[in-house]
Amino acid sequence: GAFDITVAPLANAWGFGFKKGAFPDSTMIDSLLDITGYTKVSLSADGKVIKQDPRIMLSCSAVAKGYAVDVVAQLLEKKGIRNFMVDIGGEVVVRGENPKKSLWRIGINKPIDDSLAVNQELQTILQVTDVGIATSGNYRNYYYKDGKKYAHTIDPRTGYPVQHSILSATVIACDCMSADAYATAFMVMGLEEAERFADSHPDLDACFIYADEKGELRMFYTKGMD
């Protein structure tokens, strides 16, 4: 699938994981694909993880911030707090009203190549409440080699960093962990597949910022955000 928690060996090989690998060749990619794929992992009746190959690695880093946001939000709700925003690294849960007694305003950054994360220019602002929001993009964690850009989003189906027109994907869902996972998946899918998927799932809303043929920034919104 487009979202796969077994992608860690590939991320390491491309230099985006917890280990810094050398730039991989096609032979290495093919060998790593042999140990990539969620169908190679299952749960036993007593809840133990069963891997078809001991070299398979599981990494939930793509949803870690979203999960952490949900945990904090649940804690606040248990304490009886009804109006709040939790933000961890740009992944957000909002509940109730903001201090001005209106919907929460959440900005989406303009996806300009910015490895130092100093750009604060906004592409758009969402007005929402009682949702989880997550954004995934390829404009901060990347490098260039031989004049070609390689970003951190790895397609687990091919083993290579994605080369799509989508620059960032923002998802609104009932919880932040789900939004986080879908945002990553949409970055892997590419614009057309992501549009079809998002429009066919009315429980989600999504906003994609992409570059057209002239390199101009364009935006796609699901029907629920029109």
Short names for language-model regions:
Residues 1-226:
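Mature catalytic core of soluble alpha/beta enzymes
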